[in-house]
Amino acid sequence: MTTIALATLALTVLCLPARAKPTIPWAEFRGSGGTGVAAESRPPAKLAAPAWKAPVAAGLSAPVIAGGRLFLTAIENGRLVTCAFDVTSGQPLWKQQAPDVPLEKVHAAGSPATSTPLADEGRVYVYFGSFGLLCYDHTGAEQWQKPMPTPQSLYGMATSLIAYRDTLILVLDNDADLPGSRMSQSKVIAVRKSDGGIAWETARPLVRSGWSTPAIWRHHGGEELIVPGSGRLTSYDPQTGAEKWFTPGFSRETIAQPVSGHGRLFASAAMLGGAADEQPDPDPFWKAMLQFDADKDGKVARSEMTRYFTFPLRPELPPEHPGFGIPLPSDETQRKQRQGETFGWMDKDGDDFWTRDEFFANLKFDRGKPRLIAIRPGGTGEVTESQLAWEVNRNIPEIPSPVYWNDRLYLIRSGGLLTCVNAGDGKLLYTERVGAPGQYSASPVIAGDRLYLVSNPGVVSVVKTGDAFELLDQHDLGEPAFVTPAFDEATVFIRTQSHLLAFRAEQDAGEIDN
């Protein structure tokens, strides 16, 4: 090679721009593809003072990031709003109100601003069960809106949007019946990003209200849209909406988003009411019942089943918590009817008392098994026998989704119980208490080689990924937190009950061990 050529090559190399740091896509619920993983992100392993802290109105949607902006939704002064913040400084950039509509009825622990937005390079898309779909550009200018009827839901709408090519996928499961039918009005739709028009719509008449976000499963055989629902998991063609396969056996309440890896699909759901094991210990339920034993005789009398009585579903919670259990109706006539039905269920000898022995003998957990399953690709019709690789029925979370990383699945359940499962065969690698008790609503997420867990009381636990449990850090946020965190290159963003916090590492932090 000539001297001139060498000089030219050297000059060319010198003039090439430095390689840009990778952009961490976290533009939808649980990040890119809903995986819950930001492999190249470098947030701090130990959380200290936040880089910034911004006040936010109430809401349960998770933050998403695109174009240097962070987006979320909230309910403020009785109005649904979409908010944008500067990622670097936390400064509010804009806030847009949705049309003024009656708000859907939600559970006391829920919010009409629960569904997480979805963003792309130029727009942000939001869904409110009370209104429908809205699309804004990154400056807050409305691009289109699509009003929709509010589905009838047991707790309020909570599903989040996902993207497939140039469409948005939205699951509208519904407790309302079709006219003149006992089938439900449930459906899944694909909406064009460009104008909000319907690309396709598929009925789901066999399922009722649910709270899970769907997922796209990409494997060697193609792409599938995976939609959990009450009692079953269903696969559709994401281009047309045609059903491909299903597997039954899930509980009435499906909340967790499916994930994939190791050539398989993983889906989970706890038993109705949140029970994590197939045969839960009845003793905590009886101890919770005794909180209504006014005369402290060790039995529950019919007369003690007052208007304040609540049958426990989550006995670890205090009775005043909205998630504790099933209260009696406020209407006196309905309350007396329910009281008689409920009491007669266990009072087999008719003496108007529940004893411990009666309670234990008649407490039934037949509301769908808690399940974590692995499905192999390639099935059609019912695939339970043909494609089920393995199944686990213990320590299944009620709300948080599993996260997959390096051939392992991680699940966090209420009480702060972290479970790690081998994704290949379903074998338990460990189950450990992280030392941060309480309920868990936020899904576990991974950045680099670290797992970030957020408890409802507001404690963040950082755990090293791997076959053995290793707690790296715990940090008390100082207020409750119910929302899955988000990441950029060096930051973990956490929404608490009233603030948005950014915990940022130095940009030149060292390499993360994988």
Regions found by a protein language model. Name each.
Residues 18-514:
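Noncatalytic, solvent-exposed loop/strand surfaces
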